[in-house]
Amino acid sequence: MRVTLIAPDRSLFDGEASSVVAPAYDGLVGILPRHAPFLTLLGTGPLTITQGGSSNRFTVDGGFLQVVGDTVRVVAERADT
């Protein structure tokens, strides 16, 4: 699936991934390919994007996560590596 992670000042990730684990406002949410359409507000915490055997970990604070088709968009109020 295609994943993008952006913050107001930069793009942090844009590529293919096998899974995403993100801090929703009410707990962690896991996204795999072919996930149902989904929209949630983000809380504060680690966001992990897995590509095959490697993972990219970011810290996000606020924003939203959207799943449409095979695309996951993460728009964070604040994000860092």
Set out the residue ranges of the language-model regions.
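Compact, glycine-rich, soluble single-domain proteins
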Residues: R2-T81
